[in-house]
């Protein structure tokens, strides 16, 4: 099915069992927030007073539930405001996925309004950070982010998604979730 990048983000969150997202919206993340509103019956958004609070809330949620915490912010100062929360999650091995908006891909590297290279900024305090420049790469990148956050030494992973990537459409193939039942107990006679 054809979906926008923003809808793909929401579908991938559902695939990962995410039911709660913490964040603070802004211009570069509005497409994602519009899609998140359409999914509000399945994914609850907790609006915080500040992005730093959102990152700490996602960390606390992960600690309390055992699930991967998710934080969403916009570009520039919105993205840099979550760095302390990511560092905390990294130091304490807490699984967290941060999804940040950014300026459009044609404006990257041009000192555009509220543009910042958040991918490089967070490298010292995350397990990995990714810039998604094509909508076709978005689903696999989000899935990889969750896998990295949850396996080995747990920790935060950041996915930076430019605004045009969230607006563009591509074919989305949902992962088939395989249910593995509990093994049957056998008795030896």
Task: Please annotate each region the language model reported.
Residues 1-78:
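Thiamine diphosphate
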Residues 19-20, 63-74, 79-100, 123-175:
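Structural signature of the thiamine diphosphate
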Residues 25, 162, 184:
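Anionic group-transfer/hydrolysis microenvironments
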Residues 38-41, 63-65, 114-117, 148, ...:
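Short, hinge-like loop/turn segments at secondary-structure boundaries
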Residues 178-189:
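Single conserved hydrophobic/aromatic residue that forms the stacking wall/gate
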Residues 35-37, 60, 103-124:
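Active-site-proximal loop->helix
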Residues 42-50, 92-109, 124:
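Short, acidic/small-residue loops that bind anionic groups at enzyme active sites
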Residues 23, 49, 73-74, 109-116, ...:
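Alpha-helix capping and helix-loop boundary segments enriched in small/acidic/polar residues
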């Amino acid at each position: 099915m054809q979906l926008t990048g923003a809808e793909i983000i929401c579908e991938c969150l559902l695939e990962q069992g995410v039911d709660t997202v913490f964040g603070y919206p802004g211009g570069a993340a509005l497409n994602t927030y519009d899609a998140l509103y359409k999914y509000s019956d399945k994914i609850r958004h907790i609006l915080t007073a500040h992005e730093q609070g959102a990152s700490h809330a996602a960390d606390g949620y992960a600690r309390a539930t055992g699930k991967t915490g998710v934080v969403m912010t916009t570009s520039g100062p919105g993205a840099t405001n979550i760095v302390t929360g990511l560092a905390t999650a990294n130091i304490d091995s807490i699984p967290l996925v941060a999804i940040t908006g950014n300026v459009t891909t044609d404006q990257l590297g041009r000192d555009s309004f509220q543009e910042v290279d958040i991918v490089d900024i967070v490298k010292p305090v995350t397990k990995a950070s990714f810039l998604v420049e094509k909508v076709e790469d978005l689903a696999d990148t989000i899935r990889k982010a969750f896998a990295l956050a949850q396996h080995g030494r747990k920790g935060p992973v950041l996915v930076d998604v430019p605004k045009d990537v969230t607006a563009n459409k591509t074919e989305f193939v949902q992962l088939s979730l395989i249910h593995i039942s509990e093994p049957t107990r056998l008795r030896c006679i």
